[in-house]
A protein has these predicted regions:
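Buried hydrophobic positions in well-ordered alpha/beta secondary-structure cores of metabolic enzymes
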Residues: 18, 70, 82-83, 115, ...
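Active-site-proximal loop->helix
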Residues: 1-41, 127-131
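Short glycine/serine/threonine-rich phosphate/pyrophosphate-binding segments
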Residues: 1-3, 11-15, 60, 85-95, ...
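Active-site/ligand-binding loops adjacent to catalytic centers
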Residues: 30-47, 101-160
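Active-site/ligand-binding-proximal alpha/beta "capping" segment
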Residues: 41-106
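Hydrophobic beta-strand scaffold residues
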Residues: 2, 25, 49-50, 150
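Generic beta-sheet signal
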Residues: 5, 28, 51-53, 118-120
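Beta-strand segments within the central parallel beta-sheet cores of soluble alpha/beta enzyme folds
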Residues: 5-6, 80-85, 110-119
């Protein structure tokens, strides 16, 4: 049996692919942070796994493929700049990791890529921390129509 907890107002296009496994979909009033908090509580009570994308190594490692594609398209040259959207921060951390790994494998020269983080104006805890030079990311209440970026308490934010 599979349960998928989602924000109740999530776009149907983000849900459809999951329906192929015939899960029980539970809409939660609130944003991704509210859903994550509830799932953490449920996993603490029941013997259920909480497979959040920020906690799954396969998702995180899969994020590196973005840079692999970019490097291939640029003839195995690292770009000067990358502008990446950030929700939980994993894409940013894995972009850095993938460039380093390609260099360690001898497939590219040492990258001098500058990575720029983009977040929605109403939900920018990582960008705010970077601008302020903070040591940790302060959670915010998301206020944006960009639901995929509406993570007010980003799991990998401090590493981005």
């Amino acid at each position: 049996m599979c349960f998928i907890f989602i924000p109740a107002d999530l776009e149907i296009g983000k849900v459809v692919a999951s329906l192929v496994y015939a899960p029980t979909v539970v809409g939660i009033t609130g944003n991704y942070d509210d859903v994550n908090r509830l799932c953490s509580e449920i996993a603490g009570v029941y013997p259920w796994a909480f497979a959040n994308i920020n906690l799954r190594p396969f998702y995180a490692e899969g994020s590196k493929t973005l840079c692999f594609e970019i490097l291939e398209q640029l003839g195995w040259q690292a770009p000067d700049h990358l502008i990446l959207p950030a929700a939980g921060g994993s894409l940013v951390t894995k972009a850095k990791k993938s460039l380093k790994e390609f260099h360690l494998l001898g497939l590219i020269d040492k990258p001098k890529t500058k990575i720029h983080v983009a977040q929605a104006a109403g939900c920018g805890p990582i960008v705010t921390t970077l601008k302020e030079g903070g040591d940790f990311v302060k959670p915010v209440k998301p206020d944006t129509i960009a639901k995929s970026l509406a993570i007010g308490n980003p799991a990998d934010g401090i590493y981005a």
